Amino acid sequence: MKKVRLPFRLFCFLLCLTRCTSVMPGYIPVTPGNPDRNSLIECYFNLGLDYSEIINFLLLVHGIRLSVRQLKRVLFSKDLCRRKNHSDIEEVIAAVERELDGSGSLIGYRQMHQRLRVDYGLVVSRETVRHALKLLDPDGVERRSQHKLKRRAYSAKGPNFIWHLDGYDKLKPFGLCIHGAIDGYSRRILWLEVGPSNNNPRIVARYFMDCVKELGGAPRTIRGDRGTENVNIAAMQSFLRRNGTDSMAGQKSFLYGRSVSNQRIEAWWSFLRNNDTDWWINFFKDLRDVGLYCDDNPLHVECLRFCFIPLLQKELNRVAQHWNLHKMRPSLNQESPPGRPDVLYFLPELNGVNSYLKSVDDDDELLVAEELCCENHVMQADETFVELAQMIMNDNNLQIPRTPVEASNLYSEVLYHIESMI
């Protein structure tokens, strides 16, 4: 194998793993229709929604009318209860310890309780989780107790009134670029993707278009910075809103501004850093400090991406899902309503507001997507390099990593075998 072709082929292989699709994974069944009622109830219950939220989702999204008494009967028949039949304390401790080995070391007991409930299916009280964290991670509890964050006033009239999007570059020294979008009113994360670039306008445009197709419309306005990555989204948004009759139709529907003033998404990046990516930054710095990773070595960068992007994407999906399902407490800003982002976004009627989603017809979507978005096949890898990577993993019995440690081991193994071919 020629030395000059290896970095290029590695890059192609990486792109195969970094798919250019981006709507939040379908953890919540919001598609209208008439699926099995009891299955819907079980799904919403396991996501942590309370009785009134479950009933409202069933009625307003699925057209299923149910009383609290009927709901309780269904839950009883399925043996679903949050205050009885608590999980074994050893299972709880084991799950907490597993989370503390990763980014869970950054979160408090409320988020830890949510992870145990949603990801592990454990029935446990918040108080038990609080005591477990105090016992297993006293230093972390003390550090988090000193943290305070002051936010500026903000106003949005309803879901899809304004979306905020931005790139997150804290992991860029390691070849990992994150891009995300958040709804201004509900604070629901609309997409959160990691890949080799968040500056390619065609890739970022695909994130936006996938979200528009999933929701069936575009927002009233979008706010982003003047980076080159936003030029396609700005053109798409203006085109999709070209026939609007409101004051923000057409080109006015994309608002440019400095990244630091894009308040909603910038505040959420702070949350992401404190609750997830800070752990990953330190993890990758450790690889660099011991000489396993060199950020000016293209081979190291591509190998790190190959081994860690799928794992990190899974983690980001989990962080976004948990955020969208968590309950936000009342704040001094009356324009930021309390509640769960998912409930605020999908059921705005409960708070007396309307969704500002602007319907988009399929012809418009397809036309814009074809012109300004990357195609799925563009992000696929070179077949010969896929065969090379599979050969290395198969010949050496290397498994797809499930944890950061396993990904680190795979990184070392793949790097060793590829360098031996040069």
Say what each PLM segment does.
Residues 115, 146-150, 338-341:
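Short amphipathic alpha-helical segments embedded in low-complexity Lys/Glu-rich regions
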Residues 7-39, 69-90:
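Basic, amphipathic alpha-helix used for nucleic-acid engagement in HTH/winged-helix/SANT-Myb modules
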Residues 328-422:
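Protein C-terminal end segments and domain termini
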Residues 40, 64-81, 125-137:
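Major-groove recognition helix of helix-turn-helix-like DNA-binding domains
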Residues 30-59, 85-128, 165-171:
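A short, amphipathic alpha-helix used for macromolecular contacts
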Residues 2-3:
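Positively charged n-region of N-terminal signal peptides that target proteins for export
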